[in-house]
């Protein structure tokens, strides 16, 4: 057999490699008392001395554009809000994706707006659907 199968192990290996690179980058920036964990509560967790300084990173490797209705964004939020996940242990949820923002995506300003504006943006997207 020549070529790659749809479920090639290479894709899984590359995804984990990407997680390790993101985690390694965070390792170089660790402060006293902080730790990095892989696949603890999600893809990469930075646990600090208090919950507000801890962060949970979901690392995604997608080639299509990140649009307002993209499953990647909404599935990440859904998982974070599951009753069995204790999001109170983390001050931040970061979606670290290889996706470019879609041209008409209202999410494209996500990284420059505050928490209240993000919540309002989510409400607006939900009200359109």
Short names for language-model regions:
Residues 1-12, 62-129:
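Acidic metal-coordinating catalytic centers involved in nucleic-acid phosphodiester chemistry
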Residues 5, 12-13, 17-79:
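Catalytic centers of nucleases
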């Amino acid at each position: 057999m020549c070529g790659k199968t749809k479920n090639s192990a290479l894709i899984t290996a590359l995804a984990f490699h990407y997680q390790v690179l993101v985690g390694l980058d965070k390792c170089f920036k660790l402060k006293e008392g902080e730790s990095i964990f892989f696949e603890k509560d999600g893809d990469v967790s930075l646990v600090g001395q208090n919950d507000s300084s801890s962060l949970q990173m979901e690392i995604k490797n997608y080639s299509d554009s990140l649009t307002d209705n993209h499953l990647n964004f909404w599935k990440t939020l859904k998982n974070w809000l599951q009753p069995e996940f204790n999001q109170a242990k983390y001050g931040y949820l970061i979606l670290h994706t290889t996706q470019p923002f879609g041209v008409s995506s209202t999410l494209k300003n996500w990284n420059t707006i505050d928490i209240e504006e993000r919540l309002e943006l989510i409400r607006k997207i939900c009200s359109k659907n």
